[in-house]
Design a protein with these regions (language model features):
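Long, well-ordered alpha-helical scaffolding segments within enzyme catalytic domains
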Residues: 25, 29-39, 97-113, 151-180
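Boundary regions of SH3-family modules and the immediately adjacent low-complexity/disordered segments
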Residues: 181, 232-246
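Solvent-exposed loop/turn segments at secondary-structure junctions
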Residues: 11-13, 51-54, 74-80, 95-98, ...
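Short alpha-helix capping/helix-loop boundary micro-motifs
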Residues: 50, 202-207
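Active-site-adjacent mobile loop/cap segments within catalytic or ligand-binding domains
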Residues: 4-16, 59, 64, 69-78, ...
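SH3-family beta-barrel domains
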Residues: 178-197, 210-214, 222-224, 245-246
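SH3/SH3-like beta-barrel fold
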Residues: 215, 228-232
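Catalytic-core regions of hydrolytic enzymes
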Residues: 2-97
Length: 246
């Protein structure tokens, strides 16, 4: 299954114009909101912590084996134009084809929920968080926190933003999007007593990640057309629903 590295902003010194929190605070809320949607769609993830920096986040990601690096930020206008700009920008590294593809998917989906869709754009950049990760990377600036309307939109749409970004990650990896249910334990049960396949896609032709013995307990995160998204040990994948007893 795909694995992504989430890097919500560590910039606690960037206050929202509303006075309700910082860039670090709200981008971590967005990352929190993404988690159940990612799990329900078979996407594993790791993330930084607020005491880290962009540089240490990149180093940590590069020590792992990730398929995508997603940095979550909100923007601010330059001196003399504070509060005057609005919009969402998905940045990618100029020579990264998959970074550009990810940015285009994110921007297209974000246009569906941002109140000014014509101001949702993609741009290339050489910023460290798209240049230095080994995995394809996107840095998304979700609105301007020095603009009253943007700041209030972010604050009141945390779950919608998290869902939208998770939907983009599912699309990037070619996975069907599934809405999460409450996570719950399940038991693998087969009539023969043999193991079942944990697959990378919800299909009998999906790549087999591992085999789960009958009687083993798994955690169920979601369901898609007769398949459950389950976590077995450290491996997230799909199991045919008839073999999972909840």
């Amino acid at each position: 299954m795909p694995r992504i590295y989430l890097s919500p902003s560590t910039q606690e010194y960037n206050p929202y114009v509303t006075g309700n929190g910082s860039e670090e605070y709200f981008m971590n809320l967005v990352a929190d909101a993404m988690e159940p949607y990612l799990l329900a769609n078979g996407i594993q993830f790791s993330r930084n912590t607020p005491d880290m920096t962009a540089a240490s986040s990149i180093r940590q990601a590069n020590r792992g084996d990730y398929d995508f690096y997603l940095a979550l930020h909100s923007n601010a206008s330059g001196s003399g134009s504070q509060g005057q700009n609005r919009g969402v920008i998905a940045f990618y590294y100029p020579t990264s084809a998959n970074g550009r593809r990810g940015a285009e998917i994110i921007a297209r989906n974000m246009q569906e929920i941002y109140p000014l869709p014509e101001r949702v754009v993609t741009r290339s950049t050489t910023l460290g968080e798209v240049r230095q990760p080994r995995a394809p990377a996107v840095l998304v600036e979700i609105g301007y926190h020095d603009n009253e309307a943007d700041a209030r939109w972010i604050e009141s749409h945390i779950d919608a933003i998290g869902q939208n970004l998770a939907m983009s990650m599912a699309e990037y990896f070619g996975l069907p999007f599934t809405y999460p249910g409450p996570s719950q334990p399940g038991v693998i049960v087969t009539e023969s007593g043999g193991p079942v396949n944990l697959r990378a896609e919800p299909s009998v032709t999906g790549r087999v990640l591992t085999r789960i013995p009958s009687g083993e307990t798994v955690t169920v995160f979601g369901q898609y057309r007769g398949w459950y998204v389950v976590l077995y040990g450290d491996t997230l994948g799909y199991v045919s629903a008839p073999y999972v007893q909840i």
